[in-house]
Amino acid sequence: MLTKDLSVTFCGVKFPNPFCLSSSPVGNCYEMCAKAYDTGWGGIVFKTIGFFIANEVSPRFDHLTKEDTGFIGFKNMEQIAEHPLEENLAAIRRLKQDYPDKVLIASIMGENEQQWQELARLVEEAGADMIECNFSCPQMTSHAMGSDVGQSPELVEKYCRAVKRGSSLPMLAKMTPNIGDMCEVALAAKRGGADGIATINTVKSITNIDLNRKIGMPVVNGKSSISGYSGKAVKPIALRFIQQLRMHPELRDFPISGIGGIETWEDAAEFLLLGAATLQVTTGIMQYGYRIVEDMASGLSHYLADQGFASLQEMIGLANGNIIPAEDLDRSYIVYPRINQEKCVGCGRCYISCYDGGHQAMEWDEHSRTPHCNTEKCVGCLLCGHVCPVACIDLGEVKFKKGEKEHALTL
């Protein structure tokens, strides 16, 4: 297995690799965190601790599927750590004693300035390397905490200042995606002394309704609630927020820990290319186990070698220059689909989708059960390629629109 140096320095702390557990059930106690370290994770954000002790519901999870796939989206109704504060602090102490070279980040959540300041002091005394301020849990809003705080720049700035009074450790502010402009809150966190941003937390959601009982899922004694949604389905949302943060002139160099739908090395590379420097994972671990880090580290190592990068740092943020406003995109040409008839299985998916959801440009030969593109009707949307189950449709002939001057293209 190829292994390159995947170490990265983030907010002044050196991580052996960028892969971390996010604050969640996967890092809830000493035993779980020790196993994660032994498996190869570079850092752990211990499940959020506070003076509030959670009393969890049962059941507390739901998921969303697509056809015959595993779940693509995951709903959880968990709150912060259910163990007493001293028990959590003892776990942090023991982890740092047993794994001094691994990074341990303490996630904290308070109800007021005094609690934020005291929690920061306590986790620094316990040996944590960094602090993550959880301003974004959707399940904690009724306790004057969680994502409601993360929607208020004033509260975020105030609580960041309180944490800085209690500790000298590097501090991250964890952002909620349940907001229109994350940059405004990130700037408030920066003013308050935050050293970086962690984003995104889960998206407020209702995943499913039991059609017979007319109750949201999961059902807790005949009721349900809105709560956090995670997994592969939220990755595009996370990438969008990270790109917007990175392109803000006052946040360009502000460190970001990326979270949201990371399961593979390709996912990891996408977050890095948009500007995240460390990566946090929960739902992928819940679905596949801690050992996914082995494939992610190996795949990322091969990618660095193939691309000629000497270090992980060299690739961070490289894709941002190619994300531009929609009105600035080149609209001078059409790309027609190219169909590999040898790979085509004659399922007709492209024909149906084009006829019912496109521009009726895909024609169907019933005798040979093969599709053909009518370029007189085709607008080059490439819907056909996206629905093809065997990937036999890709980019083909390019035609410049009437009156447009031909020029070099990157497709």
Swiss-Prot record:
Domain spans labelled 4Fe-4S ferredoxin-type: 335-367, 369-398
Pfam family membership, one: DHO_dh
EC number in record: 1.3.1.1
Binding-site list for [4Fe-4S] cluster 2: 354, 378, 381, 384
Cofactor stoichiometry and binding remark: Binds 2 [4Fe-4S] clusters.
Stored Gene3D superfamilies: 3.30.70.20, Aldolase class I (3.20.20.70)
Top class in the EC scheme: oxidoreductase
Catalytic activity: 5,6-dihydrouracil + NAD(+) = uracil + NADH + H(+); 5,6-dihydrothymine + NAD(+) = thymine + NADH + H(+)
Active site: 137
Amino-acid positions noted as binding substrate in the UniProt annotation, renumbered to this chain: 76, 134-136, 201-202
Binding site for [4Fe-4S] cluster 1: 344, 347, 350, 388
Molecular function via GO: 4 iron, 4 sulfur cluster binding; dihydropyrimidine dehydrogenase (NAD+) activity; metal ion binding; NADH dehydrogenase activity
Example of a GO biological process term: pyrimidine nucleobase catabolic process
InterPro entries in alphabetical order: 4Fe4S_Fe-S-bd (IPR017896), 4Fe4S_Fe_S_CS (IPR017900), Aldolase_TIM (IPR013785), Dihydroorotate_DH_cat (IPR005720)
Cofactor(s), by name: [4Fe-4S] cluster
Keywords: 4Fe-4S, Iron, Iron-sulfur, Metal-binding, NAD, Oxidoreductase, Repeat
Function: Involved in pyrimidine base degradation. Catalyzes physiologically the reduction of uracil to 5,6-dihydrouracil (DHU) by using NADH as a specific cosubstrate. It also catalyzes the reverse reaction and the reduction of thymine to 5,6-dihydrothymine (DHT).
Subunit structure: Heterotetramer of 2 PreA and 2 PreT subunits.
PANTHER family noted in UniProt: DIHYDROPYRIMIDINE DEHYDROGENASE [NADP(+)] (PTHR43073:SF2)
Protein family per UniProt: Belongs to the dihydropyrimidine dehydrogenase family.
Protein name: NAD-dependent dihydropyrimidine dehydrogenase subunit PreA
Gene that encodes it: preA
